[in-house]
């Protein structure tokens, strides 16, 4: 199904890209049933890759939600047959609003196709469903074509990983792209600090009080000299050293 679409990444595809790039508003995706589910995914992918977009349910649209559409928007309507009643019902209002229309259909000669500014033919020769009824190959083709649109727009917008991170701060992707040392470091009153002359017992009290498991050791000028961790103290105690009574740092050698 996807291979059938390769020759159709053509002048119509380019026209759709130009229409969206010239759009002063947002990309509105609409579709009913399985096409609507594909439309939701398309809207999410576009929005997360630099093209402001949202999904509009066509049945809700004719009951007031068309108010979300403006004359500066581009509407992408999905329908395999191109004759889905709920989608066709919103076309007159879209024209009155002044939004541009891209039809993503399996039949370019359909009513939806004839009313569109740009027609994207995503038709397939047959469905994977053995009954030839359930949308399978057709939805896969529409999804792939939608991803192609999103990625072409991403490149045209020179969209970067840093921009992607702003829109996707959650999950492992967000942590990978946004998490910095500054995000998790402790500073100011949150950072436990002791002088090099501090006894280990006193340092241990500071470690316990701050709950970080370590203290920064500085000199009289506040310049970092090293780090003392609770692990360092445990290892020192395991060697039988009287660290609690040590008035100053000492080198500890093995027996």
Give residue ranges: language-model regions.
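Short, structural beta-strand-to-alpha-helix junction motif
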Residues: 179-185, 197-200, 242-246
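Single conserved hydrophobic/aromatic residue that forms the stacking wall/gate
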Residues: 241-255
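A glycine-centered beta-loop-beta connector
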Residues: 184, 207-210, 215-233, 246, ...
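A short, polar/charged loop-to-alpha-helix boundary motif
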Residues: 128-132, 233-243
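The conserved cystathionine-beta-synthase
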Residues: 193-211, 237, 250
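Glycine-rich phosphate-binding loops that contact phosphosugars or nucleotide phosphates
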Residues: 25-144, 150-153
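Long, charged amphipathic helices and adjacent flexible linkers at domain junctions
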Residues: 163-186, 191
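An N-terminal, well-structured beta->alpha segment
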Residues: 1-22
